[in-house]
Amino acid sequence: MSAVTPEQAWEVFQQADCLFAESQVESALDNMAVAIRRQLADANPVAVCLMNGGVVPFGKLLTRLQFPLQVDYVHATRYGARIKGGELEWIAGPFVPARDRTVLLVDDILDEGTTLAAIEARYRADGAKRVFKAVLTRKVRPRKVAIDVDFVGLDIPDRYVFGYGMDYKGYLRNAPGIYAVAAVHES
């Protein structure tokens, strides 16, 4: 990853295209929560945050899921501080046993699908009864792996995006909406 200063990150934010305002993202999270409750309210699921990007959508969803569940997290990444994916690196988790349990994986974005598919495979290998996948955003693009998600907040164009958990070179995960990086800053 090329180093970026806070000032450069702020410039990226100021020049970005707002794809979805905060109110639109919150509405999408409301809709996701309703769908998740319908499917999983009686399943005693383990809700799993996929770090780091999943932390914002996970936290926002969690308080909307008014039913018994356990919380866990995993940190497995193909990106680290890079903008292009590499080999999958397992950093932490899972911690709550998944055998014979329903698992809900929550992430910020479905891009190529490789990371989410690998995490799903790990939970299936660990004996999960069912694995559901929820993503705040799904890029409209071909995937490197065949993967379907059960709950999607928003479909987004195939651009470099940030906000609501997604980052620009380690910054801007906290942006109050979903933004696309201007072409001048994409490298």
Give a label for each model feature.
Residues 1-187:
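PRPP-associated nucleotide enzymes
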